[in-house]
Amino acid sequence: MKKLFAEQADTLKVMTYATDIRPITSPIPLSQALEGVQGLDWSLCPDTELTVSGVSVSSIDIEDNWLFVAIPGLVQHGIRFLHAAVEAGATAVVTDREGSERAREMNPDIPIVIVADPRRASATIAANIYRHPASALKTAAVTGTNGKTTTTYLLRSILRSTFNDPALCGTVEIRVGDLVINSEKTTSEAPEVERILALAREKE
């Protein structure tokens, strides 16, 4: 597969992880960022119009005025990392009811928005913040048990004969324009996917 892109080897710029992607965006009100999220409870968030400019489910992938979405995991709840997220610049936290109770004990001043499903909410929030980039792109997905990665490389090679430089998001790497980004996970979280799509829109 490496041979398919050998001709671009000297011009590609390698980025470490998808979480390093920072597409161009503008701050929007929190209420707009959460538009379309199901089961919202604003009772612990006194200011629905505070502005946010990014979102992440990881406390180590947070910048100033971003939303931290704390997701319950199999072993521990993401709210455990609230302090780290706030220190990094998180302006509010989105989590479930269990997470909200723990968050109030850890940091009673942080605005908290309670949702039924934080992971699903993160997808809607990211799409809102990054202005629904998929709507401006032609996208295709490859599913199956075996051969998905090989198929995506072959398809990208074929599509390059018609389109300028199709982006690729897979389990091995992500390619957007002249950027090559290592895939940290088999399946990226929704905010990362939306950032990848937003970057692809910028590169068009």
Residue ranges of model-derived segments:
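Phosphate-binding loop of NTP-binding sites
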Residues: 37, 121-204
